[in-house]
């Protein structure tokens, strides 16, 4: 079993925070285990919660269009979220919920070792880049711990 498959199983069994009580399905990352690019969002939405896969709803359709427009195949990237379970009513995840999932996202990044991490949204940006201002760095490549974030 690949290490990322093991992480996915741990995500599905996780009970580190109260989101395990309200989720339909936990949503582990999915994609190419040797990806040069990782996309990291905030948390699963309604469709993701139903299907147990990241970015299959409206945001996923938009991401698919962007990938297609840039000539990137979705099968060549890895897609995940900071928080692996849907917060009720799609609210912003709490710090406790983010911290409960930190090991998962850190392990995913460590194992894949991508060339660039595309950070989507304030929650992902704040978690991965220690709360640095997203507006100040929007559209720029930021380096941290030898990794490139966009």
Task: Identify the residue ranges that each predicted region occupies.
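A polyanion-binding, active-site-adjacent surface
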Residues: 1-150
